[in-house]
Structures are given as C-alpha cells and as structure tokens.
C-alpha cells in the first residue's frame, strides 16, 4: 500500500513546515474544515483487505485470478464488525477493488467481479453487506478504490481507463450511503497519469463531506496525508499544517499498519505474524498519541470470517486501551475556576483558552494530596488552528522549590500522550512555552499506567 512515488514523503513535509515557522502568523491562520475536525475525533479506524488474494495465498494479485476462486462460504460481516467494534475503532474502510482489479460489488463496468464468482450464485454484494453491517454496529463506512488495475486492458489507455475508473467511483459514491473516507493508494502506478481533478470532482458530486486520504502529490485535492511508513508510527513532530510549494494547508496524518506483520491480506498458517498486544499498544501511543489517525489493517480469511486469533487480539486491544484511560487522575484536582475546569473535566467538547493574544501561558493543576502518575494526555482545540509550538509538562519540586520538567516537545495537535517514569506531586502544570497565538486546550489528563512507562518516547 505504498503511495505514488511522486508523492513527497511525510517526513519531508514536516521539515518543510518547520522551515515555515518564520511565517508563524500564516501558520496560525490555517484552520481545518468541519469534516476534518470530525474525522480527527474518530482517531482509530480499520481497513479491510478481502479479495481473490485471500483464496490464493497472495499479497499482490496480478489480475489473472479466476473469479471462481472467490467463494467465502461462511461470510459474516456482522462477525467482522463485532470484532472491530470491540477494538475501539470508530470507522471502517473496505478495499472495494485492490490492484488485481477484482471488484467486490456487482459493478456494471466489468465482469471481473463477484458477479462471476460462485458466491451467492454471482448475486452478492460484499460492499453493500459490509456497509450495512458497519452502520448497524455504529461504525462509519468508507471505501478504497485502487487506481492501479492489473487486470483491465483499458489501463493501457489513460483516457479510456479514466472513464472506466470514474464510472466505478460513481457507483460506489452513489449506492452505499455516506462515506466517511475515500482512500487513494498509488502503489504500482509508476508513470501512469490519472485525471485526479475529475476523480475528486466525481466523488464530491455524490459525497461532498467525504474525507479524501491521499498524499502531498495530490495536495490540491486530498484532505489527509500518509504518514510515510507502514509501521503505524509517527516518528516526527506532527504538525497538521504543511507547506507545499509555498502553500499552507491543513492535512492531518493517517498512519496505516497491518494487524499481521507485513501482511494486508490473510494467509494460511500465518498466526505467528499476528502482532502482540504490547506492539499494538505501542503503535497506539505513537500514532493516536502523536496526534495522528491510526488505520489498522484487518484481513478476513477464506471462510469470510475474521480469524479467531485476530478477533481475540482486537478485543484485547480495545479492552487494554479502555482500561489504561479509565481513571483520569486530573479529575481529582482542586477546583479553581470554570475556565481551568474546562480542560480538566474529561469532556473534549469544552476547552481552556490562554489569555487572548498570548504566546506563552501555563495551566496549573493542584491536588488535595500528592498523586503518582507516569502519563500525560493533552489535546488542543483545533477548530481555530494548531497553535502550540513548544510545551512542557512540569511538577513542583518541593525540595528544590522550583518547577521540574518531566516531559517536553513541540507539537500537541489533536492528542499528545507523553510517558515518563512515575513521579509524585501535588502540583502539576502544562507550560505552553511558545504558541503562534493563544493556546486552546481541550483536555489535560494524568494517568498511572502500570507496565507502560516506556511504551512511547
């Protein structure tokens, strides 16, 4: 699922942004759309890979597979969604067509689809079934439609293929309800030129609010960008605004990684590649905890079910995340003002604001007795832009009679989780050392998480 080679790496974009701080006023003026704000609040989604590859022990289909191999005799989208819901994910993106060109809906554009499979005598619709089941379980639904098509001969003619691809997109965008996200993956496309402007125009005709995932090569059209690696980690300070050819735009990061190491599709006898719970928790800390969206790859097997081991791991993952963040110690603070309480109430719909026009501020939290904690979770209110450029979490050192830093970084963004060795204090503060405009803090939370002192740097 690597993106087009002409797309600029995300790390490069971060560097470009850092270089643009000399124009901090422009940076602070860039704001997200309401759709981007709502999407970032989802935080965690799942992308589903299921196609002829599933039945042939393949990762990269070449378009030669006979549709007759596709026959998931125990297909149960409700079982998929139950497992995904248990993980804590909020949305699902289905790979409706991967690079092999096989379509999971009864498209009118090609016979290379489930219409020619034995499943349901060619009368089934995986996309429709998955969309309905996702919404049944409270999950938002989106689709991935690969531009690269290794089966259809029209791919050799850019004009003919654009017409074909746009017709497929029109079917998906007009028949399956609201789409939370549309994934553009350019893997394998090489020098092929697509009419991306028309692709986005077609999508927007039917889905004006869909979040388009792409990368900076589609800067004019994409709403979110690739992290630059399939590790599911954000290895850099995460800024939502990036500079592309002198233009600043709000482009939050989505970080994709498969549940089974290196495999997006299911393969038999491959349970050993299932990621451990600890690895998934570290991934969460370094994606969601670094202000990015986590997109976890889940692969149904050739029965049409999420494998039991994968479903169990997803459930464990969801339970562990919920347990970790069940006891917010900041709720035990001594109340001082309604303004301060807005960042300490556990309600992300309220926020504390630094003094108007300020570039430095502190949010101090006092407790009736010392608390011990090893994790701080901070969220910016981003509707007016990402303003914090440098911050620190500090405790009052009674013996030294001064504030002591226990964590520091630059970006906060949607959510920043800082971890450190356990400390004990009755006074804690968030020190906004530099901001392009007054800081807005949705949440400042503190936790003691056993066995998690080193999961995120």
Name the predicted role of every residue range.
Residues 9-19:
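Bacterial N-terminal signal peptides
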Residues 1-11:
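Bacterial N-terminal signal peptides that target proteins for export
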Residues 24-359, 364-372, 377-379, 383-387, ...:
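Mature catalytic domains of secreted/periplasmic carbohydrate-active enzymes
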């Amino acid at each position: 699922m690597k993106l087009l080679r002409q797309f600029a790496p995300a790390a490069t974009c971060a560097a470009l942004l850092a270089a643009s701080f000399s124009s901090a006023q422009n940076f602070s003026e860039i704001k997200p759309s309401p759709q981007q704000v709502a999407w970032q609040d989802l935080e965690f989604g799942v992308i589903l890979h299921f196609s002829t590859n599933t039945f042939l022990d393949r990762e990269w289909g070449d378009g030669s597979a006979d549709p007759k191999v596709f026959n998931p005799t125990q297909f149960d989208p409700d079982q998929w969604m139950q497992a995904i819901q248990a993980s804590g994910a909020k949305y699902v993106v289905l790979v409706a067509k991967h690079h092999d060109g096989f379509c999971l809906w009864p498209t009118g554009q090609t016979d290379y689809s489930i219409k020619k499979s034995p499943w349901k005598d060619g009368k089934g619709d995986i996309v429709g079934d998955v969309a309905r089941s996702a919404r049944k379980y409270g999950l938002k639904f989106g689709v991935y439609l690969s531009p690269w098509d290794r089966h259809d001969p029209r791919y050799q003619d850019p004009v003919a293929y654009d017409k074909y691809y746009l017709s497929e997109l029109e079917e998906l965008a007009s028949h399956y309800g609201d789409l939370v996200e549309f994934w553009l993956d350019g893997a394998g496309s090489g020098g092929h030129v697509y009419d991306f402007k028309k692709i986005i125009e077609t999508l927007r005709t039917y889905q004006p609010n869909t979040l388009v995932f792409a990368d900076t090569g589609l800067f004019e059209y994409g709403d979110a960008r690739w992290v630059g690696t399939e590790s599911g980690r954000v290895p850099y300070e995460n800024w939502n605004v990036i500079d592309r050819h002198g233009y600043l735009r709000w482009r939050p990061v989505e970080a994709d990684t498969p549940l089974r190491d290196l495999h997006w599709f299911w393969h038999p006898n491959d349970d050993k590649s299932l990621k451990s719970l600890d690895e998934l928790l570290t991934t969460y800390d370094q994606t969601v905890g670094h202000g990015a969206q986590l997109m976890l790859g889940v692969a149904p097997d050739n029965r049409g079910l999420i494998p039991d081991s994968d479903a169990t791991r997803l459930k464990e993952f969801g339970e562990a995340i919920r347990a970790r963040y069940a006891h917010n110690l900041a709720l035990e603070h001594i109340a001082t003002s309604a303004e301060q309480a807005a960042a300490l109430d556990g309600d992300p719909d309220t926020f504390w604001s630094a003094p108007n026009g300020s570039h430095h501020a502190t949010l101090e939290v006092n407790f009736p007795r010392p608390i011990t904690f090893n994790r701080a979770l901070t969220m910016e209110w981003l509707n007016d832009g990402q303003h914090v450029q440098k911050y620190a979490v500090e405790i009052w050192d009674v013996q030294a009679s001064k504030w002591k830093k226990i964590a520091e970084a630059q970006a906060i963004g949607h959510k920043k989780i800082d971890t450190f060795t356990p400390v004990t204090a009755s006074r804690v503060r968030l020190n906004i050392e530099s901001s392009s405009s007054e800081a807005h803090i949705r949440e400042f939370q503190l936790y003691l998480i056993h066995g998690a002192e080193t999961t995120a740097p």
